[in-house]
Amino acid sequence: MSTSKLQVEEIRERIRTLRIEKGYSQDYMAVMLNISQNAYHKLEKGYTRIHLEKFIDIAKILEIEFPELLNGPDYVYVFSGKYKK
C-alpha cells in the first residue's frame, strides 16, 4: 500500500487542524514528543518525514485513534470495532 504525497499532506493538515482545535501549541506538541519546537514545526510543515512511531505518538497526544489520524473522522474502520459516520 503506497501513500501518495497528497495523502501525506492531508494527514499533516489534519494534525495541524486537530492541534489547533485542542488549543495545543507547537511548543506543547514538541515537549510531548521530546523534540524541539523547530523539529516539530518541520514535521508539521512537511520539511522532514514523519516516521510511523511519531504518527502514533501524535495520535495519542491528540487523543484520537491512529486510523482516524490517517483517514479522518468519517473513516469506517473495523480494527477497533468503531464505526464513524
Enumerate the predicted regions with their spans:
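A short, Lys/Arg-rich alpha-helix, primarily the initiator
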Residues: 1-21
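Short, charged recognition helix plus adjacent turn
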Residues: 1-2, 60, 70-85
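Residues that mark the N-terminal boundary/hinge immediately upstream of a DNA-recognition element
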Residues: 14, 25, 51-54, 65
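Residue-level detection of the helix-turn-helix DNA-binding "recognition helix"
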Residues: 20, 34, 45-47, 74
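Alpha-helical residues within the helix-turn-helix
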Residues: 20, 31, 60
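Short alpha-helical DNA-recognition segment
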Residues: 23-42
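Short, basic-rich loop-to-helix N-cap that marks the start of a DNA-contacting helix
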Residues: 47-60
